[in-house]
Design a protein with these regions (language model features):
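ABC family nucleotide-binding domain
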Residues: 1-169
Length: 169
């Protein structure tokens, strides 16, 4: 569940988001409609912490993810966002495109854990890279199955239709 409480975003003197309040429950389908320049993309970027709000709260699973002290990467793994303009790497297969971000994030966490463990008694788990890739691949196959593209795992984006590319992204 996501609770948005009095979310505001200014760019200089221009107030783009003016105190948005809403609750999005698990399974809800939400459409954000408005004229060009009305703040739709800014709102979505704030929800996914790609843009810092000027004020307000975004409560995701009980945590205010707009709080700068919160490690957003922990929560971002549970979120998804499909952009109007998507980018797939044409030199990578569909499965490699899907695995790329989770593998890079997990490797970054692994490096942080290694450094942490060098200086602290409370040890963090350090997962082998092979395990990270295996888990990412399993999850990617599940996602492809959910969107009906499991037969496209090993093809390149150039062979997909526009709708298929959108679903992969």
């Amino acid at each position: 569940m996501i609770d948005v409480i009095d979310l505001k975003k200014n760019f200089g003197d221009n107030e783009v988001l003016k105190g948005i309040n809403m609750t999005i429950n698990k399974g809800d389908i939400v459409v954000v409609i408005g004229p060009s320049g009305s703040g739709k993309s800014t709102f979505l970027r704030c929800l996914n912490c790609m843009e810092d709000p000027t004020s307000g709260k975004i409560i995701f699973e009980g945590v205010d993810i707009a709080d700068p002290k919160v490690d957003i990467n922990i929560h971002r793994r549970k979120m998804g966002m499909v952009f109007q303009h998507f980018n797939l790497f044409n030199n990578k297969t569909v499965i490699e495109n899907i695995m790329l971000s989770p593998v890079l994030c997990a490797k970054k966490d692994r490096r942080k854990a290694v450094v942490h463990n060098m200086f602290h008694k409370d040890k963090l788990p350090v997962h082998p890279v092979k395990e990270i890739k295996k888990e990412a691949e399993e999850n990617a196959h599940k996602l492809l199955e959910r969107i009906g593209l499991e037969d496209k795992a090993d093809v390149y984006p150039s062979t997909l239709s526009g709708g298929q590319k959108q679903r992969v992204a």
